[in-house]
Each structure stands twice: as C-alpha cells, then as structure tokens.
C-alpha cells in the first residue's frame, strides 16, 4: 500500500466510524477465508460491514470520532465490524462467535460509550430498532382495533336479532 491508498483507507474508516451506530473489535486469528466470507455476508445482510485493517491505520482513523475510546483494543490480528443500526454489528458478531471459538470479541463502542466484551454481548441480546418499532406499532394499533370491535358490537347484535326474526318469520 502506498501513502495515497493508506490515506484513502483512513478517510473511509474515519467516515464509517463517524456514521456507525456501533463498532465491534475482535481477534480473528485462525479463521479460514470461507469463515471470514461467511461472517462478511451475514454482516452485510444485517446492514453492517466487516473490515480488516492495519491496527496503526485503524487507530489513526478512530482519532476525532466518538469511538476513539476503543483505540487500546487494537493489538494483534483484529477486525472491525460496524453498522449504522446500533444492534446489528454486535448481534451478528456475537452470534458468529458462539459458533466459532476463533473469533474473540474484545469490545466495542456505541456512540461515545466504550464497551467491553460482555457489554457487546449484552447489546447483542437487545431487539433491533426495527423489531422495537414493530412492537410499538402493534401496541398502538391494538387499542384502536379493540375500540373498533366494541363500537361495532351493538350493530352486529342488532343485525343478528333482525336476522333471527327474519328466519323465524320464514319458518312460520
């Protein structure tokens, strides 16, 4: 890599860290290419990204961002997983680490808050933003549905009584 490529990488990572809802840092020593591609595809499907960069360049890119507190995590073979959704990157990384003991989560950041490995795993257990929105919409819609049923109940009762009278007259 020449200097221009390094500058581009640092600029790209800096923008990514600035826009990221969460960042996860993990050791990946011993992971095969197929496993890494699997992790990347799962992360991409969840709306996140996995990058492997030189630690020195990642540290430079982190300077001046909200996630600057995790600079100390960059030792050894590290990968960076990030996503705009604060839950997506930790969830995919934690799920992958459960099935593959060679991926060791070191920690991460969500905004200005730095997280240790347990914090990242705890964050991964939370529902995603879309799931929370769906639950909220469901909670809001349920009372409206019940009110509509209660309002329509007297009309339905009257219709049943009239229907019963009509059947009674036809039978007689």
Swiss-Prot record:
Record's GO cellular component terms: large ribosomal subunit
Molecular function terms, GO-annotated: large ribosomal subunit rRNA binding; structural constituent of ribosome
Keyword Membrane found: no
One of the protein's GO biological processes: translation
Function: Forms part of the ribosomal stalk, playing a central role in the interaction of the ribosome with GTP-bound translation factors.
Quaternary structure and interacting proteins, as annotated: Part of the ribosomal stalk of the 50S ribosomal subunit. The N-terminus interacts with L11 and the large rRNA to form the base of the stalk. The C-terminus forms an elongated spine to which L12 dimers bind in a sequential fashion forming a multimeric L10(L12)X complex.
Annotated family: Belongs to the universal ribosomal protein uL10 family.
This protein's name: Large ribosomal subunit protein uL10
Organism: Mesorhizobium japonicum (strain LMG 29417 / CECT 9101 / MAFF 303099)
Taxonomic path: Bacteria, Pseudomonadati, Pseudomonadota, Alphaproteobacteria, Hyphomicrobiales
């Amino acid at each position: 890599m020449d200097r221009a490529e390094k500058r581009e990488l640092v600029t790209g990572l800096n923008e990514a860290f600035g826009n990221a809802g969460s960042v996860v840092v993990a050791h990946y020593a011993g992971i095969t290419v197929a496993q890494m591609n699997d992790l990347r595809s799962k992360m991409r499907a969840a709306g996140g990204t996995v990058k492997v960069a030189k630690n020195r360049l990642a540290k430079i890119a982190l300077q001046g961002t909200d996630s600057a507190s995790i600079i100390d995590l960059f030792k050894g073979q590290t990968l960076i997983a990030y996503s705009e959704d604060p839950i997506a990157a930790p969830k995919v990384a934690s799920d992958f680490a459960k099935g593959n003991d060679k991926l060791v989560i070191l920690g991460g950041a969500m905004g200005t808050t730095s997280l240790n490995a347990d914090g990242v795993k705890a964050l991964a257990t939370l529902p995603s933003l879309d799931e929370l929105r769906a639950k909220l919409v469901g909670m809001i819609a349920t009372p409206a549905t019940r009110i509509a049923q209660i309002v329509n109940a007297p009309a339905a009762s009257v219709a049943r009584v009239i229907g019963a009278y009509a059947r009674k007259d036809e039978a007689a």
